[in-house]
Structures are given as structure tokens and as C-alpha cells.
Amino acid sequence: MKKLTIGLIGNPNSGKTTLFNQLTGARQRVGNWAGVTVERKEGQFATTDHQVTLVDLPGTYSLTTISSQTSLDEQIACHYILSGDADLLINVVDASNLERNLYLTLQLLELGIPCIVALNMLDIAEKQQVRIDVDALSTRLGCPVVPLVSTRGRGIEALKLAIDRHNANDNVELVHYAQPLLREAGFLADAMAQEMPLQQRRWLGLQMLEGDIYSRAYAGEAAQNLDTSLARLKDEMDDPALHIADARYQCIAAICDVVSNTLTAEPSRFTRAVDKIILNRFLGLPIFLFVMYLMFLLAINIGGALQPLFDAGSVAIFIHGIQWIGYTLHFPDWLTIFLAQGLGGGINTVLPLVPQIGMMYLFLSFLEDSGYMARAAFVMDRLMQALGLPGKSFVPLIVGFGCNVPSVMGARTLDAPRERLMTIMMAPFMSCGARLAIFAVFAAAFFGQNGALAVFSLYVLGIVMAVLTGLMLKHTIMRGEASPFVMELPVYHVPHIKSLIIQTWQRLKGFVLRAGKVIIIVSIFLSAFNSFSLSGKIVDNINDSALASVSRVITPVFKPIGVHEDNWQATVGLFTGAMAKEVVVGTLNTLYTAENIQDEAFNPADFHLGDELLGAVDDTWQSLKDTFSLSVLANPIEASKGDGEMATGAMGVMDQKFGSAAAAYSYLIFVLLYVPCISVMGAIARESSRGWMSFSILWGLNIAYSLATLFYQVTSFSQHPTYSLICILAVIVFNVVVLSLLRRARSRVDIELLATRKSVTSCCSGTAGNCH
């Protein structure tokens, strides 16, 4: 079979991702475009004659970029297409928005690269009574047009057949440009490198006349002739860019008049009716908060019901199983305990997180594919405008509920450097999936029936602190107004199950692999430090270990937030959590259960792997029945109650160490708000600078320590009023000083704002191949 590389390109919300998932299934690889942190997805699939590598290009409305302050999407798409890596392009077109989508189609066809138009979302078009003559559209465009409903898999085989058959587009003159434009485009094309096809050189000439700033990178000496061409055109037409766009739109209008009835089509009545409620100025925000609460409720309840299978199952295999092997093969006791506690305990920490994290990713994917996430940005627009940000900036913040890294990277879709930087500074406060793993454990141990409510309050607190951070920046070092907010609202539709599963699987796999490697390594590292004293001797009691001795010295720093000296394990969790937040659970699990593992005698004769696995399945089945019982459906928060049988395990030890729910909640506040994990720090440094990364870390530490101290000291004020009053006043005075210093620093910061993406804007300024 011949190998073929295909670029998949289309407007946002055209169903491109769904088609990508339909074609490639789970055979996907996710990376970054060279030099930038924009995600690059590749997948594999086969047709009758070809083994295809499919490259998913960023969603974009056109290939023209007129400002360096815009997003990188157009730049990356343009560079990849001109690089020559793609043998064929598949342009995904939304049939229900044909006229707008055809602008990008015309730009692609003008390049002369073999192209297939995938006419997607025909089911939505039919509901809106839009009729399209596919054969007539194919004739007018000069390339194959394949009708699709990607959510149902309709038309996939026809698309594969078109891939095998299509080698070149028909020689059709699509757009009739004014003669002066063609003359100057030809003049610029003649000055370019002759090894580039003439059609592409003329296209680049038109792009330069239109004001595209990145086409000049390919023009070579022709870029020096641009001013001459524009000067000649000035005598013949007012605005060359306007004439170019007008010619394309006239072509699109002529095509649509012949092939469709879009002028008489009806908009979706269902979408319009639902939007009257969802986008209501009074109901929109409460509905958004309810949707977020529902997500946490389902993640904790249903995910929690599935947890025994992963928890007890991993204990049976990776802890008791390792102990059985160690005793059977006569390993030294210290080695058996080390392997069971370090390696086995690390795996046992990761796997029980899978159900709840997986449920959250599934819910987020559903919201994204259904069309609700775009509405959430509009709902939050008024609030974001108060911060001097457009509502569009809330979209990457919502992504932060899954992971803060793509949230930080998503800020590059914003236009102004100030808006990008403010969004980056706010992103780490959005509670990610790794933090949910921590919250779920503490909710079960301390908050009983109010567990889901406690978790929801932490998520809301994260949003509030992100907003307050934005307000602080607006009134101190980043004053300014928001740019206008224009965003397309896709119609509502039921997400495709296969696409949901693939998206959830990709996210969950990334989380498990990333978290697993770190947690297992940290667990082994902690087990080693927990087994020896500072003098290097093996200890019988972990309280005499090197880890305990060092941690006790540091723990008094956290006394104001409710971490007492004997709870040194919690201090270790905060430090390891800086590597990855999910490691906090692994650290606490390893340290709180260390004594139990040392003290418990393991009898190999009593170990029966099959019985323990059957017990895990039985517990899971019982949990599922309880979760979906009538009593729980009537009172869903009941399903998140803590398990009293865990009193002798890690949760029981944790309960004793913290002493109260107030101390535990204060600890969670600190975990929510303090330093982001290493991967997020790296993303912040790449998207802005190391200086802004340092600012984000210091600001997060201050907010976390201040808020956790205020909460704990207020709730425990009656126990030590004098100490609490001193702590509260110290926090207030310190923050007043910090805000005063930030206001004075404004004049020095403003100059540096435009430089925050200096390395990014220049990353693709060379040859086309540099961006792939």
C-alpha cells in the first residue's frame, strides 16, 4: 500500500475533530508543533490503496493573518500547507453554514494542492431545510465533494474512496480578481523562488497584497517589492485587501445561489429556544454553576461507585501479590515491604483515581461536543468584561477543569498580549482533574454526606480567586479595556458516543501515564527515605526516619493553616505536590499507611488472589446498586458519604492527624491555590517568560497561605483567640503591602507586556518546514 499524508483543515465547530476520530479511532498521537505549544494531532487509517497519516490542523476561518497579535492557528495551518508535507487536503465544511465556510475552501483551492471537500453536518442542514446540490458544488469548485454526517459515520467509506481516486483539482477559475490585482500578484510572483509552483507564488502575492504578515517569510526578495506594488495599486483602487475579500465573497455568493437555498433556510428552532434560557442574563450563571456541580456530583458518585474495583483489585495484585511473591521467594523483609509500599502502593494510588477522573473527562467532552461550552463563554462575558477581558478568555479557563497546561496554552487564541497574560495568570487557579483526586479522598474521609458540596465549593473558590486575581491585575499592573468579543455559537446536537469515548480515553490515558510515572517514582523515593534515619540506619518506626525528622522542622510554618507538628506527612505532600498535584494523594497514602504495612503480619497461606478480586467486583456491584437506588436518586449527595470501614486505613490515620474537618478544608484550600505543578510552570514560562512564571508562583503561594490561614483561624478562633487574631492581622497587613507595591510597579510592567510572546511570534518566521 502506498503511504499518503493528508492535512485535515476546517472552520472551528465544523465537526473536524469528530471526523478525525471517526477515521483514526484510537490510533492517534498527540504532540506539539515544533517551536510552539499548540497541540498537534496525528492519526493513522487505511483505504483500499493507501496507508494514510492524517494531520489535524488547527481550526481556522482563513489562512490570512493581518496582525502579529492574533492567534497562531492561521500561521500554523498556512505553514504546514505550504511546506509540501501534505499530499492531499481534506477541507471539512459545515453544510449548515456553507457560505461562511467556503471562504477557507476558496483559499485552499487557489493554492492548487489536491483537495477534497468533506461536506459535513448534513443532518443539521436538513433540519434547517437547507438543500445542497452536491454534484453542482463539486463542478463549481473543481474538486470532489463528499456528503457526510460524521457523528453517525455516514459517508466515511465514500470519503476513503475519494481519497484513493483524487490526484488533482480541475483547472477552474474560481475567483475573478480585478486586473490590477492580478498584475501586481504576478509581479510579486516573478520575484519569488522559481522552484515554488507558479500557482502558489501567485497565491502568496495576493496574500501579501491582502496584508498577510506571514506570507512575506516565503517571498524572499519579492517582499522588498511589496511597497512598490501597493503604491501602484493606490492610484487604481482604495483598499486592495477589501477588493480581494470582496471578489472572494462575490464568488461564494454566486456558488451558493446555484447549489443551495441558504437564503430561505430556517435556523434551528430547538437551539433558539434553548438559548433563550441558557443565555438569559439572569438564568445563565446559575445554570452554568448547576452544570458544574452536576459534573462533580457524577464524578464523585458514579466514579466513587466504581472505585472498589480499581482500589481493592490493585491492592490484591500489586500489594498483597508482591508481598506473597516476596515471602514465597524468601526476600528480605525490608525489601518486601519496600516493594509493596513503594511500587505497589504507587500503583494502588494511581488506579483508584481512574473512575472519578474518567467520569469528569467524559462529562467535559460531552459539554464541549454538545455546544454548551461556547455558551458558557458568553454567559461569563459580562463578568470577564469587568476584569478587562473578553468572554472568549473564559474558554481556556474552562479547559483548566481538565488540566491547567492546555488552559495556559489556550490563552494564545486571544488577540491582545495583555489579555493573554492575564488569562495565563488566572489559569492555575482553575481546579484541574488531579486536584479532584485529592478532594475526593478528603471528601470521603471528612465531609460525609456533604462531600460533593465541599468539592463544589472548592471549584467555585478557584473560579472566584481567578476572578479576583484578574481584578487585582486590572487595577494594578495590567490596566486596560477588553477587546470586542465575537464568537460563533454552534447549534446544539447530541455528541457521538465513539467520539466521546475516544476523547475521554485520550485524556485519561495521558493523565494515568503522566501521573503514574511520577507517583510511582515518588512513592519509591519516599519509601526509601522513610526506612532510614539521618545517620543512615534502618528504622523500625517511621517517626524516626530521615523524612520525618526533616519534615518536622518545616511543619511549624504551616501551623497557621491547621497542619500540626505531628502531621508532618501533610507537609511532605505539599512539597511533592509541586511536581504534580496527583502526587499529594500518593504521598499521603504512602506515609499514612507505612506504619500499618510495617506492623501488619502477612501470611502467604491466607492470600487468595481470586477471592480478593471477586470481593472487589462484589463491592463494586453493591456500590453501583446503592448509587442508583431510589433513595440516592432522591438525595444524590447521599452517594458521596464517607466509608466508615476505612477508619483503620489511610483515611483513618489522616482523620486522626488533621483532627477536624476545618483543618482538612484549610489544607485543601492551600492545595487548590498554591504553586502549579511543574508542567504548568513550564507552560507559563514558554507562553510568557520566566519572570511571569515566578510571579505566578509567588502570587499563588501568597493567596493560598493567606486564604487558608484566614479560614482556619476564623473557624478555630474560640480555641486560641489571641493567636488567631495575630495571624489574621498579619495576613491583612502583608497583602495590603503587596497590593501597594504592585500598584507602584505598573509603570515598569507595561513596557514589558508586548514582549511576553516574543519567542512565540518568531517561531515560524523561517521556512515552512520549521512549523511541522
UniProtKB/Swiss-Prot annotation:
Subcellular location: Cell inner membrane
Membrane-topology descriptor: Multi-pass membrane protein
Ranges annotated as spanning the membrane: 282-302, 309-329, 344-366, 383-403, 427-447, 453-473, 518-538, 664-684, 691-711, 722-742
Cellular component, GO, one term: plasma membrane
Swiss-Prot/TrEMBL keywords: Cell inner membrane, Cell membrane, GTP-binding, Ion transport, Iron, Iron transport, Membrane, Nucleotide-binding, Transmembrane, Transmembrane helix, Transport
Binding annotation for GTP 3: D56, L57, P58, G59
Pfam families: FeoB_C (PF07664), FeoB_Cyto (PF17910), FeoB_N (PF02421), Gate (PF07670)
Chain positions recorded as GTP 2 binding sites: G35, V36, T37, V38, E39
Primary role: Probable transporter of a GTP-driven Fe(2+) uptake system.
Family to which this protein belongs: Belongs to the TRAFAC class TrmE-Era-EngA-EngB-Septin-like GTPase superfamily. FeoB GTPase (TC 9.A.8) family.
Record-given protein name: Fe(2+) transporter FeoB
Species annotation: Salmonella paratyphi A (strain ATCC 9150 / SARB42)
Lineage: Bacteria, Pseudomonadati, Pseudomonadota, Gammaproteobacteria, Enterobacterales
